[in-house]
Amino acid sequence: MSSTSEVLVRDESGSTIVEFAILAPAIIGLLFGVFQVGLGMQAQNAMRSIAQETSRYAVVEYMRGNEVTDATIETWAEDAATSAPYLLNSTFDARVVSVTTPRVSGTFEKTLTLTYTPPAVVPLVDWVSPQLTYSRPIFVLDE
């Protein structure tokens, strides 16, 4: 009987699967964490690009003589965010606020603020992604 237990103690068959079972949850958790960080970085870069495109849209419209409203700029930014290439989900929001005293004389200054919550990809955990915010000024000529 002691020889059987000695054989079982020295037997290493199946050790690989046991080690994998111990390490797999940690490795899979790290993988989902990398995906979550990547989604956050993509969302932040998308927000910066959307802000740049929205600013350009507002400036070009003012140059054409079309005085677009703050609501029109917000709608344009939200439409750009939900379409290709960004394809952000419905948690995206754009707000435009006119600045009462512009920093550059002879201009209208507006502040564009974008907020977005990236989707959570971590399964089996009640994880909520942090809300991302990006702001930038828009200067248009006062003619």
Describe each PLM feature range.
Residues 2-78:
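Alpha-helical assembly-interface signal, strongest on the long, hydrophobic N-terminal helix that forms
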